């Protein structure tokens, strides 16, 4: 069945900290409240999600199933794949031409395309095509010919803040303040999480090997869509996926982060109970979150990520 997803029904979100870092300790500029409309992304009218209820779309090995494809407002294709290691996400570039969806890698090379077929009688959507995606160095080739639930959100059906947030953002900076048993204030430029992890470790955070590994990535971008999905895209071509939800009332100042289909997300400084403050400017958005850390050291972490 094809359905239209409206603001009250938007689903929920995960994994956000995976953002940026650099060196100065100068406080970042605080965005002023902005209540205007940001320019519409290229595919704000054509963005769509295809969800596959069954596990019948498997890769050639039979070990992975394609569960969903989200074609976003900014021209991204976010794939949700069920593997033997759990639910994984990977993000590519996309071009939408009517009912044809072309997927490209970081070099602009086509890695597959889909065609959408709609039955007037039953209002069913069928997607067909062949696509090869790579997750953690493993290639999965899916030959697709299946019914799917098609979900689209017309820009007129959602709030201004949802339209403003739903796009791909580049990480500009991250400012972190640790207070309590650990005292640290660090502004980082770009998406290198390791800079932040190293600074926290030097300040006595006692991060273990697993926690340091989770903070070893470089974030290139973040993609929000109007269906409530967030993708965090790393420099190694991997992605994390989660759902997002407005946590406040009509003013929509906060989003809540929640897990999506059992996919792992977050790290030492982010939990699935995180609530994120959202502040827009005419050219950027600042996301601010606070996490209480309890363990061998007890402290609070306040993180402000600026996306442009």
List the predicted regions and their residue ranges:
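Short, solvent-exposed loop/hinge segments that bridge or flank secondary-structure elements
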Residues: 49-74, 171-227, 257, 261
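C-terminal motif of bacterial Sec signal peptides marking the signal peptidase cleavage site
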Residues: 17-20
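Contiguous, well-ordered beta-strand patches that form the walls/edges
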Residues: 72-126, 206-293, 299
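Acidic/polar, low-complexity intrinsically disordered N-terminal segments immediately downstream
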Residues: 4, 22-176, 308
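Short, low-complexity, Pro/Ser/Thr/Gly-rich segments in the mature regions of secreted, periplasmic
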Residues: 299-308
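Bacterial N-terminal signal peptides that target proteins for export
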Residues: 1-8
